[in-house]
Amino acid sequence: MARFLRLCTWLLVLGSCLLATVQAECSQDCAKCSYHLVSPGDINFLACTLECEGQMPSHKIWETCKDLLQVSKPEFPCDSINMFKDSNKQDESHLLAKKYGGFMKRYGGFMKKMDELYPVEPEEEANGGEILAKKYGGFMKKDADEGDTLANSSDLLKELLGTGDNRAREGRHQESTDNDDNMSKRYGGFMRGLKRSPQVEDEAKELQKRYGGFMRRVGRPEWWMDYQKRYGGFLKRFAESLPSDEEAESYSKEVPEIEKRYGGFMRF
């Protein structure tokens, strides 16, 4: 019995809610017919509302109002307009994906999210490169294995986001890639981030030609590092006190017996 009463209560509540919704819709439709579609007085607003709610047996006024509402609907409703907008966005994204390959598939969502979080002001469009550097930081450096894509990454971002002309940056990137092509292949994006003077670059090239990759693979042994920590500057002073190669040779000529007896031990 309690369940039946609870069910009846819920039905009454739902019925009242539906009735209020229907009354609101009928009032809106009849008001539109009475005051916007025809001249005032041609359609009675109260009679139209009662017929719409089903409280009157006749439905002539309501039928007339429905016909007027059907005729007054736009040729392209809001839903159709939204569908056209969505289709246009899809076409644009398809064209971008076709033009730039997998770049938009890989980074498109990230760029859109960053644009929503940090919109570009009109007065900041002139400084497009600085804005891109602040927004994306070292994001494009992760793509170092793709070669030419890394060299033109900032130009591609400027073109996609519409921040301005990128001809100057293209020329600059081409020069930098031609000069550091060999270093980029060997070290990836590591050497590209270091700014060195011409003198240091020449010395590095000479060392590279002379020793190749040997000095990079072979470092100081662990025992030498332990001695360095333990004795500090004592080893440096001891090394300075050692004779040079020329002094050692003259010393060996003057004292041949010691040289024969101890060999090269006395040199150290």
From Swiss-Prot:
Q: Does the keyword Transcription regulation apply?
A: no
Q: Which residues form a coiled coil?
A: none
Q: For this UniProt entry, which residues form the secretion signal?
A: 1-24
Any Pfam family from its record, for instance, is Opiods_neuropep
Example GO molecular function: opioid receptor binding
Where does this polypeptide localize? Cytoplasmic vesicle, Secretory vesicle, Chromaffin granule lumen; Secreted
UniProt PTM: Proenkephalin-A is cleaved by CTSL to generate Met-enkephalin.
**UniProt site positions, description: Cleavage:** 111-113, 133-134, 215-217, 219-220
Set out the biological process GO terms recorded for this chain's protein.
chemical synaptic transmission; neuropeptide signaling pathway; sensory perception
UniProt propeptide residues: 197-208, 218-228
What are the boundaries of the region Disordered?
162-185
Source domain of life is Eukaryota
As stated in the Swiss-Prot or TrEMBL entry, residues carrying the post-translational modification Phosphoserine are: 252
**Keywords recorded for this protein, A-Z:** Cleavage on pair of basic residues, Cytoplasmic vesicle, Disulfide bond, Endorphin, Neuropeptide, Opioid peptide, Phosphoprotein, Secreted, Signal
Q: Where is the composition biased (Basic and acidic residues)?
A: 166-176
Report disulfide bridges, numbered on this chain.
Answer: 26-48, 30-52, 33-65
Cellular component annotations (GO), alphabetically ordered: axon terminus; chromaffin granule lumen; dendrite; extracellular region; neuronal cell body; plasma membrane
Protein family (similarity comment):
Belongs to the opioid neuropeptide precursor family.
Recorded protein name is: Proenkephalin-A
**Gene that codes for this?**
PENK
